[in-house]
Amino acid sequence: MSTTYIPYRLDGKVALVTGSGRGIGAAIATQLGRLGAKVVVNYANASEAAEKVVSEIKSFGTDAVAFKADVRQVAQTAKLMDDAVAHFGSLDIVCSNSGVVSFGHIGEVTEEEFDRVFSLNTRGQFFVAREAYRHLNNGGRIILMSSNTAKDFSVPKHSLYSGSKGAIDSFVRVFSKDCGDKKITVNAVAPGGTVTDMFHDVSQHYIPGGEKYTAEERQEMAAHASPLTRNGFPVDIARVVGFLASNEAEWVNGKILTVDGGAA
């Protein structure tokens, strides 16, 4: 008896999501598991949070495991991919989510801060993509993380973060050519303001005079940046990643999908 094919499902696929112990990464890992994929939940420090994500994914009837790796370190990135393949037997989807945020006027940014941001947001993602190419099955998916501030939305004192994500847009365009020999598609999502712990920590920078308002007031104000007059949440990003990971997204390649509710 043949199994009925269900569009957008990921049954039989193995996915790896970096930085997926919390926030957007956790939502992505959970969504891929909900769609049927087995998931490697990567974390750098928050092991307890990562194990909670693993438990939630397993509740959907699929499998998951948490592996620690700091993707700033290329050797750890390579080992993470090796361990994923050793554990599940193959690898079909790699989502690069790890990142840090930064604010600072150009006249005040230090070399140390520049290196902190670019070592993860840019260099880290480059080598996640390289190792993904080396480890993925033919027809796999690489999905990187950009930002609407890379191109569409300018924020004062946000040059380091915006620039670190702008490089991702160029990577995606060229990687999609390099990965064609293995029929691997390469895309990125570019979230706008998304309500996470990080959002509450830095939302005052995105709203003029934001220091005068409470976190709750800033969140309400941010909702009006979109014509839909609501905030973005991690699940909004995760659903788009789920689509890009599916067979139905095969003809989407080398693209940046902005996910901001029309805010930019």
UniProtKB/Swiss-Prot annotation:
Q: Which SMART domains match?
A: PKS_KR
An example molecular function term from Gene Ontology annotations: oxidoreductase activity, acting on CH-OH group of donors
Cross-referenced InterPro entries: NAD(P)-bd_dom_sf, Sc_DH/Rdtase_CS, SDR_fam
- Reactions mediated catalytically: 3,8,9,10-tetrahydroxy-6-methyl-1,4-dihydroanthracen-1-one + NADPH + H(+) = (3R)-3,8,9,10-tetrahydroxy-6-methyl-1,2,3,4-tetrahydroanthracen-1-one + NADP(+)
UniProt EC number = 1.3.1.-
Q: In which pathway does it act?
A: Secondary metabolite biosynthesis
Q: Which UniProt keywords apply?
A: NADP, Oxidoreductase
**For this UniProt entry, which segments traverse the membrane?**
none
Active site annotation, chain numbering: S146, S147, Y161, K165
Instruction: Tell me which residues bind NADP(+).
Output: I24, D70, N97, R130, Y161, K165, T196
Give the protein family: Belongs to the short-chain dehydrogenases/reductases (SDR) family.
Role according to the record:
Short chain dehydrogenase/reductase; part of the gene cluster that mediates the biosynthesis of the dimeric xanthones cryptosporioptides. The pathway begins with the synthesis of atrochrysone thioester by the polyketide synthase dmx-nrPKS. The atrochrysone carboxyl ACP thioesterase dmxR1 then breaks the thioester bond and releases the atrochrysone carboxylic acid from dmx-nrPKS. Atrochrysone carboxylic acid is decarboxylated by the decarboxylase dmxR15, and oxidized by the anthrone oxygenase dmxR16 to yield emodin. Emodin is then reduced to emodin hydroquinone by the oxidoreductase dmxR7.
Q: Which PANTHER family match?
A: NADPH-DEPENDENT ALDEHYDE REDUCTASE-LIKE PROTEIN, CHLOROPLASTIC-RELATED, RE15974P
Name of the featured protein? Short chain dehydrogenase/reductase dmxR18
Organism in which the protein naturally occurs: Cryptosporiopsis sp. (strain 8999)
